[in-house]
Design a protein with these regions (language model features):
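Active-site-proximal, substrate-binding regions of enzyme catalytic domains
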Residues: 2-224, 232-300
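Cofactor-binding loop segments of dinucleotide-utilizing enzymes, especially the Rossmann-like FAD-
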Residues: 229
Length: 300
């Protein structure tokens, strides 16, 4: 175990990550929240992602536990959770409709003196009606085909990514995971200890971590990257200074390094795909497996 390290060379670290992403000996894994992100991307951006996955060849993998977590969303019809912002469109439309009649009845010449609507009370009322009508049209247009669209996205995911799923014997990991996780979480050993209070799937992050370690060990993989959007402090933390980074000690054979930096998909995460900034910057985790286990986290 080492003392925490407060500073690293950001440029050097980014170069290291970029090199690993293009390294044919580096395995790449994704977290469940990357699959959920696909529901939040437009058609072109999703295709960019699928093209990048193809460019990775047989280096790209999806842990079995990721599929387990995603399947729960599908089976319980909760993929709308991935698009919580869309529900606000209807909410805002209804809210505006509820207040529009009051506003139109309340405004008068004296209230509008000195404004762009001075002497134009009816113009203001007409614009309020136009806004209300536009919000209703937008809400209807987006909600009309949302269920069908989500089914389409799921079908895409299955077609493009199913062959990337690992064949892990997940029960060999789950069997003792809870007991080990309790010991680790009680001592704040990352990853995943922040989920200790969750009622369900509190061991999920730890199981995914174990699954990746097992794959790397069994296949003699010495370098790997996990792409995730998890921002909890049991995976990464946010120092006051943008350039301050550190090591999170996790045991004699485990070390976690945190790097807080904005990372654009087009230049780092998907170097071979153009027009991919729409995929948003992601949290990257680099795992180098030598004689010890070292985990490196890179966040935006």
């Amino acid at each position: 175990m080492k003392f925490p390290k407060r500073n690293i060379d950001i440029s050097e670290y980014l170069s290291e990550i970029k090199a690993l992403l293009g390294d044919n000996d580096c395995a790449i894994f994704i977290d469940t929240n990357i699959i959920s992100q696909l529901y939040r991307l437009n058609d072109a951006a999703r295709q960019d992602f699928y093209n990048w996955v193809k460019s990775c060849g047989d280096r790209f993998h999806i842990p079995v536990w990721v599929i387990h977590e995603y399947s729960n969303k599908i089976h319980h019809n909760k993929t709308t959770d991935y698009l919580s912002e869309l529900s606000k469109i209807k909410q805002y439309s209804n809210d505006f409709s509820n207040i529009s009649d009051f506003v139109k009845g309340y405004v008068g010449e004296s209230l509008l003196v000195g404004s762009i609507y001075q002497g134009k009370v009816q113009d203001l009322k007409d614009e309020i009606d136009a806004i209300e009508d536009s919000l209703k049209k937008i809400s209807t247009a987006i909600s009309k085909n949302i269920a069908k669209h989500q089914s389409t996205v799921h079908e895409e995911i299955v077609k493009q990514l199913e062959e990337r799923i690992l064949d892990t014997d997940i029960f060999s990991i789950v069997g003792n995971a809870d007991n080990i996780f309790c010991q680790r979480s009680n001592n704040r050993i990352p990853p995943g200890y922040k989920d200790n209070a969750k009622e369900e799937n509190r061991v999920g992050d730890y199981i995914i971590w174990r699954e990746i370690l097992q794959y790397c060990r069994e296949n003699n993989v010495r370098k790997a990257i996990l792409i995730t959007r998890d921002m909890k402090t049991d995976i990464t933390y946010f120092p006051d200074n943008q350039t301050v980074e550190g090591y999170r000690p996790a045991g004699n054979t485990e070390t976690i390094r945190v790097a807080k930096i904005a990372l654009y998909m087009s230049s780092i995460l998907i170097p071979k795909v153009t027009n991919s900034k729409s995929l948003i910057s992601k949290l990257l985790l680099k795992f180098s497996h030598h004689n010890t286990k070292t985990w490196h986290y890179l966040s935006n």
